[in-house]
Amino acid sequence: MTTIDEVPGMADETALLDWLGTMREKQPVWQDRYGVWHVFRHADVQTVLRDTATFSSDPTRVIEGASPTPGMIHEIDPPEHRALRKVVSSAFTPRTISDLEPRIRDVTRSLLADAGESFDLVDVLAFPLPVTIVAELLGLPPMDHEQFGDWSGALVDIQMDDPTDPALAERIADVLNPLTAYLKARCAERRADPGDDLISRLVLAEVDGRALDDEEAANFSTALLLAGHITTTVLLGNIVRTLDEHPAHWDAAAEDPGRIPAIVEEVLRYRPPFPQMQRTTTKATEVAGVPIPADVMVNTWVLSANRDSDAHDDPDRFDPSRKSGGAAQLSFGHGVHFCLGAPLARLENRVALEEIIARFGRLTVDRDDERLRHFEQIVLGTRHLPVLAGSSPRQSA
């Protein structure tokens, strides 16, 4: 039995949600044995994510011997973050993202074309779809796509018990160094021969009057590549799992595809791919009246915030028709670090679900298939999701 002092693993979702509910009620701000502070309630999580002056995104502040990674946008605070984000923001405007829909649909149909009655959703669609799209945006060749999965898989497999452990920072660097070296080589190529892609835009850009060097551009590209495919890979699996648990929504989506965006949004709240986000304190502060010292790590539980009854009515019920009452689901972050690629992730998952329904009607999770595997840490979702293609809801009515 999990105690209040033990954080359950991501693979046991029931135990994790029970623990988060207990913490929201009994210890909404809590320090673990590693000295990391955890925040569980929606209002408090939102406050931490919004206040970048007090809660920095740079984890190296509290890791002995670590130094900031130039260009790693999700670890950079304003005002540098604002300037760096502006470099690629035009690639993520609503119009630009909307223009990607035909390509996303073509890729999705192509990937599903050879799927049989039984297949692994992650291998067939959830991984290759977002990798293809983000790699094309960056200008990376198809022959390298499989390698990206190896790198991201190695990253989420790193044992991360103590996030302040200097050895952990070294292990992360060991995993990311080959990816960064690969992207650094691509940056050098684009600097010599620029094209119409995000890497070319990065190497030619100026931030505060100076050009980004290849290391900064490569680190920025690393962040875009990893975030650009892990989120959709995990989210699409979570959508199918959730609809499998609530099958009436397969029929509702088939009858009215206009409901699909709300389904995607509700799954984001219900099962966020990244259930927690970390910050570090720049000064002594308080959260919900609890003193927190300077230079410590603060772990905000987005999954818990999204299940907070003070923010969402009946939060443990999956309800795509719910009205938030003004409370935001925080799965893409909040404030200046709100995920740049959120519109792309929403579009990819909407199109993917539309095409799944058009081809199969519905999918059923094959729980007896030994390939079914959940991530143990970092992300909430399935590494492999075996599914069975169902008959069309219109045919089985």
Swiss-Prot record:
- Give the record's GO biological process terms: macrolide biosynthetic process
One Pfam family matching this protein:
p450
For this UniProt record, give its keywords in alphabetical order, as a comma-separated list. Answer: Antibiotic biosynthesis, Heme, Iron, Metal-binding, Monooxygenase, NADP, Oxidoreductase
Q: Which Gene Ontology MF annotations are present?
A: heme binding; iron ion binding; monooxygenase activity; NADP binding; oxidoreductase activity, acting on paired donors, with incorporation or reduction of molecular oxygen, NAD(P)H as one donor, and incorporation of one atom of oxygen
Q: Under which pathway is this protein filed?
A: Antibiotic biosynthesis; erythromycin biosynthesis
Q: Which reaction does it catalyse?
A: erythromycin D + NADPH + O2 + H(+) = erythromycin C + NADP(+) + H2O
* Cofactor(s) named in the record: heme b
Q: Per the record's keyword annotation, is Oxidoreductase included, yes or no?
A: yes
Report residues binding heme.
H81, R85, R279, H337, C339
InterPro entries in the cross-refs: Cyt_P450, Cyt_P450_B, Cyt_P450_CS, Cyt_P450_sf
What family does the database annotate?
Belongs to the cytochrome P450 family.
Q: What is this protein called?
A: Erythromycin C-12 hydroxylase
